[in-house]
UniProtKB/Swiss-Prot annotation:
Protein name: Nodulation protein E
Keywords: Cell inner membrane, Cell membrane, Membrane, Nodulation, Transferase, Transmembrane, Transmembrane helix
Family in the record: Belongs to the thiolase-like superfamily. Beta-ketoacyl-ACP synthases family.
Organism ancestry: Bacteria, Pseudomonadati, Pseudomonadota, Alphaproteobacteria, Hyphomicrobiales
Record-level GO cellular component terms: plasma membrane
Annotated TM spans: 329-348
Gene: nodE
Chain ranges of the Ketosynthase family 3 (KS3) domain: 2-401
Compartment(s) of residence: Cell inner membrane
Catalytic site: 162, 294, 331
Matches recorded under NCBIfam families: PRK07314.1 (NF005589)
Native organism: Rhizobium sp. (strain N33)
Function (record text): Proposed to synthesize NOD factor fatty acyl chain. Involved in the synthesis of a highly unsaturated fatty acid moiety, which forms part of a lipo-oligosaccharide that is responsible for host specificity.
One Pfam family of this chain: Ketoacyl-synt_C
Length: 402
């Protein structure tokens, strides 16, 4: 069995907005959410920038469930609920075992872990929180989504650094293609704004001091963000049978590994993932109109990704639109490619390519059309989403107009 898989609902929240429409509106307008972080979880750490969710949307999640959630799980549940509302779906005894969820996370449970560290080592507490372990496990977000919505089909977590959401979506597509499920919720979530995580990223010397400028010659690194993005995936037959509005089709998946270095990228792995994605979708290079680049804003990554795109697409590389929306929502780690999924499907829906914000100076090593600073109207029939994680774990998705 090899069923077509379509998207019928999307949900998200990040520094740009607390639902998918507001996120897309800010992307279209090229607005960046990057600024000073003010959360109390940084315990007085100053001079740190990021793309922070200032206020969570109103919700009716039961307090008993809330106290069992770390922030990354809460964000995933909020995004999943929005996606379900847009899809016009609910889960009940008739379909629960054919309806699952897969959520990718880059890191998990940071709030619970740091709170216990401070309580035990700094403040002399005798015991950790009773819910610290279930709060912190990487699969907690998927489990909380399942419990919140009553999903009893395939439910599990995925963690592969900043390719986590694309890997989660790819895994969900496979569940539907092989007939194990009819409907899946899939995406990613991350909430890295706690003291120890921010300091660890700063120690790597990849954090920009001002903002994220992907593909610009004066780029100085990435910027951290928090957020979640989720999509309702259905078999084409299931969606059409219930009269659902189809947003886009997930036409292809390409996965690969560099087998090279924990932190340095290699061009061959991303090249292989893009080629595999096109082959899986039955697409030619000329069919692709837009690539949402991994585009972290580091010198090495942006240079490598440009070269990989040129290798795969040849002369057509100069005809496509490319952009990195991390310039606006920052690098949301496990949630990054889920938010970029929203950018891809909305580009298809509205015929608008979101820009690479904060772009200032052309780089001869990154000389493709990166849609600098201003969104561009163009017909987008096929969009690719690139996610190239540390340790060389690569996941590329192809979205197609239906």
């Amino acid at each position: 069995m090899d069923r077509r898989v379509v998207i019928t609902g999307i949900g998200g929240l990040c520094g740009l907005g607390t639902d998918a429409p507001s996120i897309w509106k800010e992307m279209r307008e090229g607005r960046s959410a990057i600024g000073p972080i003010v959360t109390s979880e940084l315990h007085g750490l100053t001079g740190t920038i990021g793309a922070e969710i200032k206020t969570l949307p109103e919700h009716d999640i039961d307090r008993k469930q809330l106290v069992t959630m770390d922030r990354f799980s809460l964000l995933a549940v909020l995004a999943a609920r929005e996606a379900m509302r847009q899809a016009g779906l609910s889960c009940d005894e008739r379909n629960a075992y054919r309806f699952g969820a897969i959520v990718g996370v880059g890191g998990s449970g940071w709030e619970a872990i740091e709170a216990s560290y401070r309580a035990l080592l700094l403040n002399g507490a005798r015991r950790a929180g009773v819910m610290d372990v279930p709060k912190a496990m990487p699969s907690a977000a998927a489990g909380q989504v399942s419990m919140s919505l009553g999903l009893r089909g395939p439910v599990f977590g995925v963690t592969s650094a900043c390719a986590s959401a694309n890997h989660a979506i790819a895994s969900a597509v496979d569940q539907i293609r092989c007939g194990r499920a009819d409907v899946m919720l899939a995406g990613g979530s991350d909430a890295p704004f706690v003291f120890c995580v921010v300091k660890a990223w700063e120690a790597m010397r990849v954090i920009a001091p001002d903002t994220c400028r992907p593909f610009s010659s004066d780029r100085r690194g990435l910027v951290l963000g928090e957020g979640a993005g989720m999509a309702v995936l259905e078999s084409y037959e299931h969606a059409t049978a219930r009269g659902a509005t189809i947003i886009a089709e997930i036409a292809g998946i390409g996965l690969s590994a560099d087998a090279f270095n924990l932190v340095s990228p290699a061009v061959e792995g991303p090249e292989a993932a893009m080629r595999a994605c096109l082959a899986d979708a039955g697409l030619n290079v000329q069919d692709v109109d837009y690539i949402n680049a991994h585009g972290t804003g580091t010198k090495a990554n942006d240079r490598m990704e440009t070269e990989a795109i040129k290798r795969v697409f040849g002369g057509h590389a100069n005809s496509m639109s490319i952009s990195s929306t991390k310039s606006m929502h920052a690098h949301c780690l496990g949630a990054a490619s889920a938010l970029e999924m929203i950018a891809c499907v909305m580009a298809i829906q509205e015929g608008v390519v979101p820009p690479t914000a904060n772009y200032r100076e052309p780089d001869p090593d990154c000389d493709l059309d990166v849609t600098p600073n201003v969104a561009r109207e163009r017909k987008v029939r096929v969009a690719l989403s690139n996610a190239f994680a540390m340790a060389g774990m690569n996941a590329v998705l192809a979205f197609r107009q239906v």
